Structures are given as structure tokens and as C-alpha cells.
Amino acid sequence: MVVSVPATSANLGPGFDCLGLSLNLRNRFFIEPSNIHAVKLVGEGEGIPKFLTNNIFTKVFYEILKKHGNDGSFKFLLHNKVPITRGMGSSSAMIVGAVASAFAFLGFAFDRENILNTALIYENHPDNITPAVFGGYNAAFVEKKKVISLKTKIPSFLKAVMVIPNRVISTKQSRHLLPKRYSVQESVFNLSHASLMTMAIVQGKWDLLRCCSKDRMHQYKRMQTYPVLFAIQKLALENNALMSTLSGSGSSFFNMCYEEDAPKLKQVLSKKFPKFRVAVLDFDNDGVLIEKD
């Protein structure tokens, strides 16, 4: 069996914990029954022992199978392309992939809602797992332990230019930097900007995104711990990025632009930040896929 799951970028400025989109950079997971348990990891995380001994994919996969009475062993080849602990949804890709794979082996019908709400057990914020399951741009929240979400597709004439620093940022640790309370003014600012940004994406009003993607809840505090991120954002917006936001909790930075502007934006960012990876990516509208039964 082969299952693939895309990278994601969440928050997108004002949409803290509720907005996210999918990027066409896929982890592929190859699973087959075996007499013994075996894991091989290729790509991102390769050669790091903890990703083999404490692997979230195999943990979730086996837990679901055992819950349904299957105690078999499997051989896993995990082909990782999504950077790990860089704010591009690597954990969500693993969790969603594990859930989809386990359900397929159990003979369950392919049901994205079922996959999503099972993934929520292991990842309690919907902003990454929802686009990982559905693809596209998603707005989501959790009510009564269930994800409520809507998706819209992202057109092919838009590209993502991702800047991926060589610095790990833990989502859990970065959350401790954030205030426990926000003022009415800050809350209204983010609510209004997230709402209008979503309408702009649905209606194709791309030139509104620069204004709508501003944030007062989380980005500044997180970016202060790694000030070069301010320079990335400034340079991107000076070179035709439609929007430029911290990807998840970082350290990656998400930039959206028109297709014709992507090569120059990549060139400018690569020249200014030669030690960082800069990648032009298509958006993904498919989400998790069973590529081979």
C-alpha cells in the first residue's frame, strides 16, 4: 500500500489555529504486512535514530489496528519530503497518513471526515490536519470533539515560495511565548482580518491579501525569537509577494505570489538568505491519497 499526504501551512497570519492550506510537497508511506516489524526512513529525518525508535506514524498506525483487533506486524518505508519541525505540517502528515493507512488495511471505506476526526485524537488543532486531509484552503474549528470545516480550491496560477531556515522551532515551546489573554481590540483585529482574507481567497481578490494577512496574536512574539524572519517577510513583500506569513509556528515562512513572480521572488530570497532553503511549490487541492492499495 502507498499513501501520500501533503505539506501544509497553517495560521496564515490572522487565522491562528483555524486557517490552513495544502502544499504540493508530499510524504509517501509504503506499508506492507510482514513477519517482523521494520521501519526505514528516507529523506527528511533520515539518520536520526529517534525518528525510528519513537515514530509517530507507526505508533498511530499500530494503535488503530490494535483497537480493532489486528495485532499483525508490518514493514514501513517512510519517504519524507516535508521538513521536520519547520512549521510545514510534518507531524500532521504523519498522523493523517497513519490513520488513512490503518483504515485502508482494516477495509474501511475511504472517508475523509472519518480520517480527519480520528487524526484529531492525536493532533488537537485542526489548522494543519484539515488541509492535509482535504487539500486546498481550509477554515476549521472543533466542536464537541469534531472538526467543522470548509474548503476552497487554490488556483494553479498562484504559487507558494517557502523559505525554510536551518533552525528548528518547537510548536509546543513557541506556544508558551504567547499571551494567555488578548484585548478586545486585538481579537477584533484578527477576527476581521481572518474573515476578509477568507472572503478574498474565495472570491479571488488576491490583491487584498497583503492587507488581510496581518496578525496581532502570535506572529510577532514568535518571530522575535528569530529576528531574521522579519527580514524575510519585508523582502518578500517588497518583491511582489501577495502575502507573507509565518508558516505554523515557524521557522519556515510562507509567501504567496502569482506564477510569473515566483522565479524572481525565489532568486531574491535565495541571494539574501543563502543558508536557507527556498522552494517554489504548487498548491495542492487533493489532500491525502491512497495511491496504491
Curated annotation (Swiss-Prot):
User: Where, by residue number, does ATP bind?
Assistant: 83-93
Q: Which Gene Ontology terms cover its molecular function?
A: ATP binding; homoserine kinase activity
Location in the cell: Cytoplasm
| InterPro entries reported in the protein's UniProt record | GHMP_kinase_C_dom, GHMP_kinase_C_sf, GHMP_kinase_N_dom, GHMP_knse_ATP-bd_CS, Homoserine_kinase, Ribosomal_Su5_D2-typ_SF, Ribsml_uS5_D2-typ_fold_subgr
Q: Which UniProt keywords apply?
A: Amino-acid biosynthesis, ATP-binding, Cytoplasm, Kinase, Nucleotide-binding, Threonine biosynthesis, Transferase
Q: Which GO terms describe its cellular component?
A: cytoplasm
Pathway participation: Amino-acid biosynthesis; L-threonine biosynthesis; L-threonine from L-aspartate: step 4/5
What GO biological process terms does the UniProt entry carry, in alphabetical order? Answer: threonine biosynthetic process
What reaction does this catalyse?
L-homoserine + ATP = O-phospho-L-homoserine + ADP + H(+)
Q: What is its main location?
A: cytoplasm
- Signal peptide extent: none
Task: Give its E.C. classification number.
Answer: 2.7.1.39
Describe the task this protein carries out.
Answer: Catalyzes the ATP-dependent phosphorylation of L-homoserine to L-homoserine phosphate.
| NCBIfam families linked | thrB
Q: Which family does it belong to?
A: Belongs to the GHMP kinase family. Homoserine kinase subfamily.
Q: What is this protein called?
A: Homoserine kinase
Q: Per the UniProt entry, what species is this protein from, by scientific name?
A: Helicobacter pylori (strain J99 / ATCC 700824)
